[in-house]
Amino acid sequence: MQIKFLDKSRLSLRSLLFLFILIIPFKLFSQTEYETSLIKKAEELSLYKDDYWLLLCHYKKSITGYKSLLDDKNFFLAPDGKKNPKAELEATIHSFFNEKTEDVIHPTYKYSSRYKWLCNKLNIDKNQLPYDGDTEYAKIKEMLKVKSFYLVFPAAYMNSPVSMFGHLFFLIESENTPHLAGMSINYGAIATDPPSLIYAIKGIFGAYPGRYEILPYYKQITKYSYLDMRDTWEYKLNLSDDQNDTMLRHILEMSFTYTDYFFLDENCAYCILFPIEAARPDTKLTEERSLVVEPVQVIRKLKKHGLLGNAEYRPSMYSKMMHKKGFMNYSQKKFVKKLCLGKAEISNIPEGLSDEEKANLLEFASDYLIFLLSDKKISQKEYQKRFIEVLTARNKIKCEKSLAFEIPVPTSQPQNPHGSHMVSTGTGVDDGDFFTDAGFRLLAHNMMDRDDGYSPNSQIEFCTANLRYNVFEKKFSLRYADIVNIVSMPVYDSFIPKKGFLLRAGVAQNLCSDGNENLAFHLKGAAGISCFILKCTQAYFFIGADNFFSGKYNYNSDILAGGEIGFITTAGIWKQKISGSIYQSPFDIEHTRFEARAEERLSLHQHLSLNAFYSFSGDFRSTKHSAGCSLRLFY
C-alpha cells in the first residue's frame, strides 16, 4: 500500500480558504450584532425625537406628525424618510455599514453632519465600520482651510423683482488668503429663465429647485458690485472652530440635495439659517418663520443672538463712481464722458489739475468704461483700447492715492432695521368729520420709515390695510387694503441713468361723481426719475395711470392718467415729504383729481415713530381739507 503525501502549497491554500470561510461569517455576524446594538441604543435614547436630529434633516411639525423641508426624495435613506424621523435614523445607522464602492458616495461622507452627531451620541467605534467618511471630509476641509465664516449681504436692488429684499450668502475666510481670493457658499434658485416678472411669479410658487453652491467670492462680488451695482456688507460669524466644522459639514451634506425655492419664505435668508443653527442649536433660528423672510430681518435676528461681528462695508462700483464724481467739476465730467465714448483723446485731459485730481479723473474713467462694457454701450474691442490708454496714463502719475481714495461708510446699516411688521393708531379730521383709524402692515418698509437696511426713500410693502371710524357719521370704513405697494426711486445720473417706478394693487375707496365713495379694485402704475436737489433733499417725478374697477362705474372702470411730483427731505430722526399730483379722466372733463400733500415723520425709537399729514384735494369740482397724526409701532 502506497502512502500519498499532500503538496504543501495546496495544503496552505486549503487552510487559508478554510480559515477565510470561518472568519467572514464571524465578522459579518459581529458587524450585524454591533449595528443592531447601535440601533437599539438610539431607540433607547429616543434620538429620533431629539431636536438636533430633527434639525439636521430639516423636519418641521405638520398636521400628521413631521415633514422635512427637503424635497429630493432620493436624499432620504428610508422610503418614508421625508415624513418618518425614526425610520430615517435607523436607515442612516444601517447605511454606515455599507461597503465602499467606487461609483457611490459613502453615507459616512455624504451625511457627514449626521455621522459626526451619531458618532458622538452613540459613541460609535469607527474601527467597526467598513469605511470612515471623515477621511474624505478631511481632504475637503484641508482644501478650503476654513478659518471662519462671514455672512454677506448684497443690498436690495429695487429694479429687479427677485432682488428687492437683498440677498444673503456665506464667505469662507481661509488662512492667509484675502477675501476676494476666497470661496463663497451660495444658496439660491437654479433657474434658466432670465430675471423677469414671470421668473418672480414662478419663484413665488416654488417652481425652481434651491441648491448650495461653492463659488469663487470674486465672481459674486463682480455680479453684485459691478453688474447689479449693489453695496455689500460682510459680518463675521462668532463661532468656535468646532462650530465652524459643524457648519461646514451641514453645508456639504445639504449640497447633495435640494429644496423647492420659494422667493418669499423658503428663500436664501431662511435656508442659510439651518447651517448656523446646526452650529449653534441653542439659538433655534429656524423655528420662527413668517410669511416672508427678509434678509435684513435675518441679520437683525442674528445680531440679537450675538452671532454677528461688526459690519465691514464693501462699496459697489456705483458708490465708488459717485464718490469720485463728487471731486470733479463740470468740465472734467464732460471730458471723461467724451473720452470713454471715443469722442476725445486722453492727451486732451483738462489742464491745471493736480496729480491727485488727474488720478481721480482717470480712476473714474476706468470704472465708467467697465460700466459701458457691461451695459453693452461699447464693444469689447473699444473697451480694451480705451481701458489700456487710461491705465497707462494713470500709471504715469506718481501719487498712490487719489482724492476719493477713502469712501465713507454709510450711516444707515443693514443690522439696524426697523421691524418689518407695523401696526398704527391715529386720529384726524377729514372734510370736517373727525375720525380715528387703525393700520396694519404685514411687511416690509414705507418710504417715510427709517431707511436702515433698505434702499433710501424706497418703498416695498405687502398686505397693508387701514380701517377708519368717522365720528359724526358713526360709520366704519375700510380705506384701503393693498396687496403690494412698491416705489423705486434710484437717483438719476447722467453717467448711469436709472429710472424709477411705482406699482400699487389692492382695493381702495374711490370718489364717484355723485359725491359718495365706494370700495373698488385699485391698480396704479407709473414710471419716472429722481435726483438730489440738495444734499438731504431728493426730488422725484412720476407719470402714469391710476385705475379703479367696480360694477358701479361706466364700463366697470374709472381710468385716470396723470403724474406726481414730490420732494423728500431727511435730517436725522426727522423726515418730510411734500408732494403734488393731478390725474385726469379721458372720458369726463370734470373728473380731474388733484392733491397737495405734506407728510412728516419723527422717529422716536428704532421701532416707533410719530407721523402726521395734511392734504388739500379735489375732484368733480369739489375740494376738501384733511389732516391727522398717527403712532406707528414696528415689530
PLM regions: where:
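N-terminal accessory segments that precede or flank the first globular/catalytic domain
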Residues: Q31-I204, E351-S488, V507, A526, ...
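Active-site nucleophile-His-acid catalytic modules used for acyl/amide transfer and hydrolysis
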Residues: Y217-V293, N547-S550, Y614, D619
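Long, charge-rich alpha-helical interaction segments
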Residues: Q297-R386
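Transmembrane beta-strands of outer-membrane beta-barrel proteins
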Residues: H421-T425, A438, C463-A465, P497-A505, ...
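Solvent-exposed loop/turn segments connecting transmembrane beta-strands
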Residues: T427-D437, Y469-L478, Q509-F521, K535, ...
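Residue-level signature of outer-membrane beta-barrel architecture
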Residues: V429, L442-A444, N485-V487, A527-I533, ...
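Outer-membrane beta-barrel "beta-signal"
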Residues: F440, T623-Y635
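Repeated loop/turn-to-beta-strand initiation elements of outer-membrane beta-barrel proteins
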Residues: N446-G453, S488-I496, F532-Y540, T570-I578, ...
